[in-house]
Amino acid sequence: MEFPQQPQQQRPAGDGKITYPLGVKEITDKISNDEVVKRLKLVVKTYMDMDQDSEEEKQQYLALALHLASEFFLRNPNKDVRLLVACCLADIFRIYAPEAPYTSHDKLKEIFLFITRQLKGLEDTKSPQFNRYFYLLENLAWVKSYNICFELEDCNEIFIQLFKTLFSVINNSHNQKVQMHMLDLMSSIIMEGDGVTQELLDTILINLIPAHKNLNKQAYDLARTLLKRTVQTIETCIASFFNQVLVMGKSSVSDLSEHVFDLIQELFAIDPLLLVSVMPQLEFKLKSNDGEERLAVVKLLAKLFGAKDSELATQNRPLWQCFLGRFNDIHVPVRLECVKFASHCLMNHPDLAKDLTEFLKVRSHDPEEAIRHDVIVTIINAGKKDLNLVNDQLLGFVRERMLDKRWRVRKEAMMGLAQLFKKYCLHHEAGKESALKISWIKDKLLHIYYQNSIDDKLLVEKIFAQYMVPHSLETEEKMKCLYYLYACLDTNAVKALNEMWKCQNMLRGLVRELLDLHKLPTSEANTSAMFGKLMTIAKNLPDPGKAQDFMKKFNQVLGEDEKLRLQLEQLISPTCSCKQAEQCVREITRKLTFPKQPTNPFLEMVKFLLERIAPVHIDSEAISALVKLLNKSIEGTADDEDEGVTPDTAIRAGLELLKVLSFTHPTAFHSAETYESLLQCLKMEDDKVAEAAIQIFRNTGQKIETELPQIRSTLIPILHQKAKRGTPHQAKQAVHCIHAIFHNKEVQLAQIFEPLSRSLNADVPEQLITPLVSLGHISMLAPDQFASPMKSIVANFIVKDLLMNDRSVGNKNGRLWTADDEVSPEVLAKVQAIKLLVRWLLGMKNNQSKSANSTLRLPSAMLVSEGDLTEQKKISKSDMSRLRLAAGSAILKLAQEPCYHDIITPEQFQLCGLVINDECYQVRQIYAQKLHVALVKLLLPLEYMAVFALCAKDPVKERRAHARQCLLKNISVRREYIKQNPMAHEKLLSLLPEYVVPYMIHLLAHDPDLTKPQDLEQLRDVKECLWFMLEVLMTKNENNSHSFLRKMVENIKQTKDAQCPDDPKANEKLYIVCDVALFVIANKSTSCHLDSPKDPVLPSKFYTPPDKEFVNDKEYLSAEAKIVLQTGKIQQPPKQTGVLGAVNKPLTVTARRPYIKTFTSETGSNASTNSQPSSPATNKSRDVSSEVGARENEENPVITKAVSVKKEEAAQPSGRKRAAPASDGTENSVSSNPSAGSQPPLNKPRRGRPPKNSAGAATQEKEAGATTGAGAGRGRKRAAPSQDPSSTASTDALSDKTPKQQKEAEPKRAAPQRQIDLQR
């Protein structure tokens, strides 16, 4: 529509009179408003009916059109008048288009502002005039009347007012047509104008910010639709706005500047094309130096990238990569925001999981606890939505966090995995494939029970009861769940679950004992006993400090409330059912709830206790259900295969489960049906199944004889048969079962003992093992009845016929250890014979005869002879290892009885201790574990803890680490025992860990490796052993323990060695070890020189009483020795040696005892030198099989020369690095030189020492001679290193002893003297 060129208002032709439509009188200000309205309606009708082609009418009513734009109408106070005038004006613009009848710009502006104001009437759809308002809107939109305003200089004011009006009036009562006309009107202005000003843009965008969006949802929708429709036109304006605010920082350009990030999010959701020019600006903002600004951009982009159906990450890879970089932002809130975003991203965009995985991995190790926590939440939430959204790596991050140092993170990880397990493994919500993907969760959750924290243990118990085997299930379903869970668990998880039940049962026992004390009359002793029980119970609850106070309060309530005591008694009663248990817990909790408090920590602590002791899984009904499941597996009618286990596995695991439960819930087994099923198991071919069944009878069958005679009559012959001809384990259990459940046990045992004792035949060792087991256990359980016949059997058969004869020749394959199924029957019989001797003595537990003394000499002699008691050389190396282990274990077992410990001589103790340095890895490993278990249970005397000091000499890093852990555990157990038991203070000599030092010093002084007390290398070895123990003991200086240790060692220097008081050399060794100990203590502690409040007591068995006239203030360590002990380095005097000798010179490392290892060349050398694996890298997960390899099959491997050896390799220091493995399992190989066959055999060394570095510079001959030098390593044989082809060394040198070996051979020749002493 164009404007006429005339500057003045157009006048009608003629006399200037206004022509009104037919029937319409003149409209002036002289008439009433009602009359004006009446006449205007007719005018409106006239204009409505006119069209653009009516030229005559247009001319006729032109004056009227001009009149309607007068002040009278435009400023009329009556809204009906104004509405009708607006409708007329809209029609006038339609009719006269494209030339408007109004030529004044001011008049036009006034008219359009007037029309815009009338549009406000659209707000009320229920108004009688709404149709006219709608007509006005429709007319304006259809004609695009507002486009006339483009020619006005200040048209923006009109458009802003129009947009504001339309956005303000729209509401949910408007239909689609109203919205469409509004859109048409506004979009035409935007699309046909020269551009959108910032003010006009603000009127649109303001409707998108959250505050306005929530106030008027329809205005928000209108703005969205408008922007979508005009995207091509308005994008440039939007880009300009954001450019000024984001890049140029001109926040004053708009009042919406502070809402830019909200607007970007909304605009992106409307159409990403609106922001096509804005996104690069965000990348710039992501790199801002202002942390808060980066955080705001990250929050925004997180929403954009994470939005459903968003393709921003694929469309804008640079921005995506830049955003991912913020996962490593220095600002904690930014990293936190990124992690939170990852959850939405994983759920909405699984394809981006790969990009996120690496960044989440780094954040799972973030130093900030909240971030590690949120990583877990992110992954678990995605996994709960769909397991396919999280890959194995992401789940692995959660698994790692179960061991986080922070409890909150550990808890989140454990609970999250438990929820996934319940959803996908228990309820199978996503099929078997998903269940298989996370089948590891059950094992890893139970493994957490191994952690020391009580919080971890309690959470595992809670998870087990709620997620793994939900206690809310019906009994049959619950037991099916437990049955197959137990069958699928790995070994460590099974042990953890067993330990969990054991701990709960122990706690039930403590509560039962506490209730029993309440039944006794009040006394000081009773109160003290109660206090002890409460302290032990508190240790099994979270936050033991608070738990002690709450348990005291709970105990007080128990004393006052008899009903509460009765309910607690019912809860821990062996006959309490699961349903009764839940009811009891509710009742006890309800009683303790009053008075009600918002938080009641006392009640929470009691709940923890009740949850641990309540039997929510196992009762008689549950055991019956388990037995039925077992029967189905045996019959082949169970769902074993569907549950992912074979029937055999299900049966074996089911029996093992019942066996464990028979310890903790024996009463629940007492039913004929259960025992009938167990009898069927006894008849099965699977030895493990039968063994478990016997053990269940043993644990639960105390009432069988009186209440179930039919079961008794069937069971007795089966037990007899198992004791005579079953496996060794079955025989043991059968004998114990008879002893436990039958009243006439003497008769029953005699019926087994007599035929077995008559049928012993050493020539058929295969048939000897089970009888020896049965006889040993019978003699232990019924010593009075069988002591006399057993003495005869021991003397005539066990010792003379079996142990002192070698009937077969062992396999000379050179291995130091073989698998259990490869051990010869004769050796197995000999091992059982040694165990029989021990059981026989344990049964007697007295020393009235000389049986104990003479019997003890036998394992001692076995150790002296290195396992070859007859010394006929018939027995193999691996069999000798087995017998040494049996002999050492026998002395350990007997030492646990006070009566036998008293008669074990210091020499026998030293022999027993040296087994921990045996040359065979498995002997050291098994022996150390037996020693640790007995010590940690406080069964062995304190002196045996000193044996762990010798582990410093173990060449295998893992064995040293294990020994250190054992020491830490033993020391903490003893310290805790002293704290918890007031009576323990009377036995400090046998409990206080510091009192191990005198035993350790004495043991090291008698170490066969200490041949030359002033030898610097030997002194360094002594220091390593002392430091191995003292480092752990001196971690804390509790009660001035450092000065106590110093005084103890100084006191030892004022005594003599009780083992050989008149031997000056022996005493000198003792004093030198003392000086080394004092040196170590002084270097470790700055407070050791303070006065000790206590005077240490020394063991009279090892030290003479101090002589008051004897003052030993001599220093036995030279200045050079002190430097060596301080630095760990031995200065070697320069010697003229050949090139190879100089290259192969041994080096040492500070503070680490050097071990000579065999270094294999690239072409390989023959068998191993010693019993450590050649490479520490292969020892991380050691098992028995890793110790046995092809190299061990060679008794006398041929030494091959290397084709070429790099000079650098030859120069590798002997004591610095462990050699690379020549092959798997060189650990237990024995190598020797075939050319050495003509050499006279060396005296047998004491076993198991790691090889020593040569004191002087290594020469070619020393290196080569290591092969035959059995004495060089004190029982350790070395393989020759690869030889350089240029070397002139002759292989004859291999048969020569090294100088060190020659020197050490002399004291070894005195070894037989020790044997004579033992046999006196």
Swiss-Prot record:
Keyword annotations:
Cell cycle, Cell division, Mitosis, Nucleus, Repeat
**What Pfam families does UniProt report for this protein, alphabetically?**
PDS5
**Compositionally biased residues, Basic and acidic residues:** 1180-1194, 1294-1309
In terms of Gene3D superfamilies, this protein maps to: Leucine-rich Repeat Variant
Enumerate the Gene Ontology biological process terms: cell division; DNA repair; mitotic sister chromatid cohesion; negative regulation of DNA replication
Has UniProt tagged this entry with the keyword Cell division? yes
Give me the stretches of Polar residues compositional bias. Answer: 1158-1179, 1225-1241, 1283-1293
- Name the residue ranges with Low complexity bias: 1255-1267
The record's region (Disordered) falls at 1158-1320
Q: Can you state the subunit structure given in the record? A: Interacts with the cohesin complex. Binds chromatin in a cohesin-dependent manner.
Query: What is this protein's function?
Result: May regulate sister chromatid cohesion during mitosis and couple it to DNA replication.
The name this protein carries in UniProt is Sister chromatid cohesion protein PDS5 homolog A
* Natural source organism: Danio rerio (Zebrafish)
Q: What is the lineage of its organism?
A: Eukaryota, Metazoa, Chordata, Craniata, Vertebrata
